[in-house]
Amino acid sequence: MQNQRIRIRLKAFDYRLIDQSTLEIVNTAKRTGAKVLGPIPLPTRKERFTILVSPHVNKDARDQYEIRTHKRLIDIVQPTEKTVDALMRLDLAAGVDVQISLG
């Protein structure tokens, strides 16, 4: 796996879950002898929704909600076979979306 790079993108609504998962990935990669770049925090996406409270009148009465999507990027440079095996066996939280690409 010479001159390979593994890029891992993580997405989650809860920043604590994504930080915990990031720490697990980084520790696993370093323990198996790979060089790790990151974690790099990417911009947080904020979706805002405004909903009318009243079904008929009172246009001024509204509720506002927000969903924040936190993102992190990790690059693993010069991964070993042990690194790939350890990352495949890693058990992460259910609320974290993981995208892995080889480059």
Curated annotation (Swiss-Prot):
The keyword Phosphoprotein does not apply. Keywords: Ribonucleoprotein, Ribosomal protein. PROSITE patterns: RIBOSOMAL_S10. One of its GO terms (biological process) is translation. It comes from the Bacteria. GO terms for cellular component: ribonucleoprotein complex; ribosome. GO terms for molecular function: structural constituent of ribosome; tRNA binding. NCBIfam families: PRK00596.1, rpsJ_bact. Involved in the binding of tRNA to the ribosomes. Part of the 30S ribosomal subunit. PANTHER family: 30S RIBOSOMAL PROTEIN S10 FAMILY MEMBER (PTHR11700). Belongs to the universal ribosomal protein uS10 family. This is Small ribosomal subunit protein uS10. It comes from Buchnera aphidicola subsp. Cinara cedri (strain Cc). The lineage of its organism: Bacteria, Pseudomonadati, Pseudomonadota, Gammaproteobacteria, Enterobacterales. The gene is rpsJ.
